[in-house]
Amino acid sequence: MMVRITNLTLPPDGDETLLKKKAAKALGLSVGKIHRCIPVRQSIDARKKENVHYVMTVDVAVSNEAQVVAKAKSKQVSLRPEPKPYVFPTVTRTSPLPPVVVGSGPAGLLAALSLAKAGLRPVLLERGQALEQRVKDVEAFWQGGDLDPESNVQFGEGGAGTFSDGKLTTGTHDPRLTHVMETFVAAGAPEDILWQHKPHVGTDLLRQVVTNLRKEIQALGGAVRFGHRLSGLTLAGKQLTEIQVDQGRVTYTMPCDTLILAPGHSARDTFRMLR
């Protein structure tokens, strides 16, 4: 168990040493009795221009936690709630067919990765190109080249956010958030996205994160197919039995009974097909 301290303030140039000193002061302890000080939440208070500062929540490892909290007598100090790690639901799938995920933006990548970790060997279909080729296609367009309707700033590995500055929009109270952020960190994102109020990966790192997620899916037995666009569904009653996929000028049929759609916001042809 650890002690949680809220509303610690830190100047913009404050470092880990200063944060530890402030935590020790809030607990009425010497710095030497602080074993670890882990940021949990960080936001910026810029209401007064002459006093811009960080507002931090930290978890502190100390001995005799309950006694420390009682002695502090502060609303800022409490015992940390025990974290509840995300556990993927038990898989009882009996179908011999692999689940299919459409779209390789954040939702599609994480869905495919979760299925791969569960041993289901998913197939991830992406109408656009792999990130390496996609970057070339977009840069060529920006230099005056032709628009590739399937490989551009909207379509391709990583989704529309690949060409943004890498800000992550998250539901801060969703218990699965920590699992998602830890997945990004394990794939190469900066560790501070775990506690920043507005987490920011950065375009350069975001591209490496996306590539690493794809490689992990493949290493776990999943398949990733670029240049493959979902174009149709076949149902028997209300049960999905097949999907149609366009690969360039060729259309093929793929047996499928489980389909996760994560096409993003610009696949209007897919939306029309689904109607």
Regions found by a protein language model. Name each.
Residues 1-54, 58-275:
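Residues forming the flavin
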